[in-house]
């Protein structure tokens, strides 16, 4: 059931190929994302889902395989440990080694020339074949600009722009893309960069946004831009739009607002405030609409109830409210956006090993 290469998978891989990276702990949310793809799939297209993993249990593989009942949708599982060898990938904060697996996609899928990579913390609210059909000839990938990061560049965190330019070597930091949704030209990537080069870059240092930084460093703005509706970043803590993206240039803000009107993919990106823990999170209703049809519904509901009823869950909620509803707004008042003292404080905080704001 667990293959070491796409060649060993019992999938035709003849049309739309979708790749996830997932651990056992995240399987319930992968199930919801998978359900959203199934419910929006066109009858005249073929969809093959490949899950890159190192620890998904046989029981979970069986459950996910049974979930995919449609005749034109298939699912298979690839073992990443064989490709990693003795390399230990760095991780910090809410990021985990699984986030690096997309770097290995060109090697793990030698018989696939084009594939969509998706994070597991999202739902697809349109036919994903439309994204797959985007022409990436001559480019390594297609992606959306990262409205959150661009908003930080423009004032919310002015250490970000110099980091992207000086550490990543980006010609224009405003070209930074969000890597949770990618249309990857695997043939192009295989011809231009080796897996060893990707992994060497990823382990050189602790990159601020991990393999997303590595991809942006390698691509350096040379990618096909797709509309942000294909990777709508949910309004995290109901602060992302008003406190961060509001600092971005007008065209970025406008595209983000257009995406919010009718998102094709809703990405629940952020260290907290996920809909399976916070029912008042942005777009939580959309998540639960698909979760209702997941075989993991009871487990997801249980996690929500635990976060609302247990001492540990309530303590975590209180901590989150204090930080994001109290401390962060107060920080913005004491150290206004765009000021030198704000930049100095953030630089010191990051230098001490602090997580991204």
Feature names for model-found ranges:
Residues 86-91, 100, 151-170:
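Surface-exposed acidic, glycine/proline-enriched linker/cap segments
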């Amino acid at each position: 059931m667990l293959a070491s290469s796409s060649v060993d998978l019992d999938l035709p891989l003849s049309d739309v190929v979708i790749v996830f990276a997932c651990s056992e702990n995240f399987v319930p949310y992968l199930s919801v994302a998978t359900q959203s793809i199934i419910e929006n799939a066109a009858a005249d297209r073929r969809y093959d889902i490949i899950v890159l993993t190192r620890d998904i249990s046989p029981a979970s593989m069986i459950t996910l395989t049974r979930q995919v009942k449609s005749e034109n949708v298939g699912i298979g599982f690839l073992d990443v440990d064989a490709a990693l060898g003795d390399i230990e990938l760095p991780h910090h904060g809410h990021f985990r080694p699984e986030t690096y697996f997309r770097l290995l996609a060109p090697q793990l899928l030698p018989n696939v020339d084009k594939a969509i990579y998706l994070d597991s913390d999202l739902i697809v609210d349109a036919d994903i074949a439309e994204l797959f059909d985007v022409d990436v000839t001559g480019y390594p990938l297609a992606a959306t600009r990262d409205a959150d990061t661009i908003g930080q560049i423009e004032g919310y965190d002015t250490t970000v722009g110099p980091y992207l330019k000086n550490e990543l070597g980006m010609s224009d930091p405003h070209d930074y893309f969000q890597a949770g949704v990618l249309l990857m030209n695997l043939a192009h990537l295989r011809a231009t960069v080796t897996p060893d080069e990707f992994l060497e870059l990823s382990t050189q240092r602790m990159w601020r946004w991990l393999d997303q930084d590595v991809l942006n460093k390698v691509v350096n703005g040379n990618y096909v831009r797709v509309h942000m509706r294909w990777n709508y970043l949910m309004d995290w803590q109901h602060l992302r739009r008003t406190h961060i993206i509001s600092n971005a240039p007008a065209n970025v803000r406008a595209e983000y607002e257009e995406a919010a009107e009718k998102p094709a993919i809703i990405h629940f990106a952020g260290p907290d405030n996920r809909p399976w823990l916070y029912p008042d999170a942005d777009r939580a209703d959309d998540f639960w609409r698909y979760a209702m049809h997941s075989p993991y519904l009871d487990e997801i509901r249980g996690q929500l109830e635990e976060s609302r009823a247990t001492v540990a869950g309530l303590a975590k909620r209180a901590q989150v409210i204090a930080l994001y509803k109290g401390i962060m707004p107060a920080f913005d008042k004491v150290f206004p956006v765009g000021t030198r003292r704000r930049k100095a404080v953030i630089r010191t905080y990051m230098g001490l090993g602090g997580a991204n704001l």
